[in-house]
């Protein structure tokens, strides 16, 4: 009901805003402001949960007159939600406080506030404040009668003296919220009041002064009934709205807690000590004990001493307290680090060793190798100069923290320091570092959506090397301090993926999809381009913002965004993230994104190549070789549809169109022609199209639409070949399960060993995924427009082919199609196999294509079969054995990837079509439509 009401209200508001441009702008400004505060509150709540702290608020107001107690107001507030207004909290509590009107002269008031803050958790190893999100303070207002027997005469006198002050405090209470920690402790013996930390405005992120608006929603996708690549189990809940006929999509992302404290929550050391002391006093005395003035003075003195000691530790300002430089090549340097989460800078002092000459020179900058020889120290005041204040003009500087740098790296880690060849303003260095750290933050959000390949932007810093009189850097006297941009040194081939002006230099999809992600993630306010680096570790990006503000001179504003939109070509990663296709008006055109879009260059390292059988007795001259028949195995009454050899190559399984499975003994290695049937049973009432084995089970797929699971016998049972012994009652194989989720004949199967999944395809146009631990179907994919004839698994990717003449590639982790080619063949595709970085497909018209998975283009096409190709056997020697309905077996040489594939041998194997092939490394087995299994030897002519 709330969702329907919200939608109706939203429609009404949109209609009003369409007629009033001024009001529309005001609403947008208000929305951005609310999002900024809500983002901070979400970060705060995450930190609360992380520290197992549950915010609670209890406010009790009691008025007692002449020993008669009257309850004025008791309220127990629930934990604050991110949308709870601080103003509403203040109003509600003020009304409660006002309800206890001015007490009579015989009354006394005591305001006691306890805040559940652990004093030990407020400082870190650097003696700097770590902001924790404390629970809501419990504020109790007690009005005690002057004749209370629990208080002595002195306490009564003190209470009377402080009566007026307490009344004032009653009307001016500070109500704490998750955004601030307020604590006041006033009693008859205390003359000190604790300072109050009030919330300040949320820091801004972007150069234009507005943090990019990001909605943290669940996975969504474009509503489209014609999109084959839409997840079945996803909901069309993606938030979108229309503005000037332009659809804006909010990308599903995951909120992350701030990794470093914000200025919103930073307090001085004296405040921390005071709060800690007050909380400790209130807790130990059960909110009612009264300390005398002498004890308070002693505590105040101790606090001052502790504060002075901490200041001496945190800020070393005298020259004799600086450590000595390790050697003459080292120098002092001040380093600045930017936090994109908090929009603030921290700085520290470090020791660096920088090369005198640059190891690389670009058009605009020089690059020097540098090593950091010390941990970050807070004694930067030793080198304080007026220029440092100019550096931080318009920026937030958090002096209570120091840069984190890369804490897990050794002191021998190489960095790159970059300076400009020409004279530039110091802001250029700070803008570049800020821009790279903002892009790093967006890269982390991109990775949280589980792309095929993750990315990373290098962390960056600004350093100022302090000048000396006897050291020169880059042939320039460094008596004037020199600024550098600093980042980690990258090894590898440096490539530029796209440019600031929209040019795309590579076919890789990951960089382009990241740029598209940033464009949608910020609701079209900005885009990250100029992506370059080693593999998917990037540096030196450029940001274009809609208003053209911030991010240096390279920010081309709306013009730069338009250049990206013109050159961008969506990829399946964009579809995976639910990003609207750029340049396509409706989701029904989304299939155009797939065609011709190169995704596989990103995925080929993740493909897995199985262990193909090795032909041990390969002829010495394969180009002049042939297949010779060794023996014919009879026993089936109908055509042999499938052949399978077990892992240890001791058994041959054959299945036929009458539903029978027969097992043959292959252990006689002395005479390869002696092969005996050892078991037989009827598995199905109709034809068996495919068999599979794992360590425990035999799987049979049939044209009756079922898959049966058979337990493997523990011992070998010898059975005669007579038909009387061929009944299932005498077999040692027992059916332990049947999968009946398909509605038509099951054509092919494969096993995902790593995840223990069974994948099947059927005439019903569906791919089904089964969990072998439960034998339950966990996912169904509406994969093709016609019957699916063949599937092949490699790593986490599944290849499927269909009678609709298409080949599709599926990511089984996401259960979605990541690539598709609609016209791979001119006829139904019957078989798929892989060898190295190549995919082989065969069709009903007798054509074989060799596809390069780096470009997904066919490199060779063979068209020498007269009828449909039924099976392909791949060997590790680099040969394909191909069976066909034209009754032949052809051998194709694929060993040289740089040369076209070619047929080296052709044999008429059966009287009619050949349906299946298998090998144990010594012999080739073929099953035909003539009900025979033939055994072949490959040898020289």
From Swiss-Prot:
Gene3D superfamilies: MHCK/EF2 kinase, Phosphorylase Kinase, domain 1, YVTN repeat-like/Quinoprotein amine dehydrogenase
SMART domains: Alpha_kinase, WD40
Segments for region (Disordered): 57-234, 276-310
Composition bias type Low complexity, residue spans: 57-70, 84-115, 124-206
Keyword Metal-binding: no
Enzyme class, first EC level, given as a word: transferase
Name assigned to this protein: Myosin heavy chain kinase D
